[in-house]
Amino acid sequence: MLSFASSLSSDNEAFAIFVNDQFNFKDRKNLLSKEASKKINSYLSTLKDKKSEEEISSFDISGKQKCFIIKVKKKYETYYPEEKGGVFYSYLKNFKVIKKIDIYIDSLDFEKEEIVNFSSEFIFGFSLKSYTFDSARKE
């Protein structure tokens, strides 16, 4: 369901970016098209103006592509990335038609080592939340 993006195309059905508390993000590798960046910045500007407290939000880049915005605190407790991954999984359950999401982890405004640590904990939390006990219940 999740994949880390080394490139983004208009063919993928959904992608997620990470923003800081002020709704800013980095497109370090210029993965986003100019049009997508413009739409994202416009949406982020709206969230900033509304002083949105939402941790996760989404909007349509086009009729076939959705962008998920994940707000991340600069300073956080050690469990925070794991918790954020679980919250993201729960949020995605509202979008049954989406089968695959590209995660643009480099949009985090962190140093490389911190990005690696955050992403591994985020995925761990996502995986934990997605786990079901169906096989244990069957007799």
Task: Please give the residue ranges for each predicted region.
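Short amphipathic alpha-helical segment within the helicase RecA-like ATPase core
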Residues: M1-E139
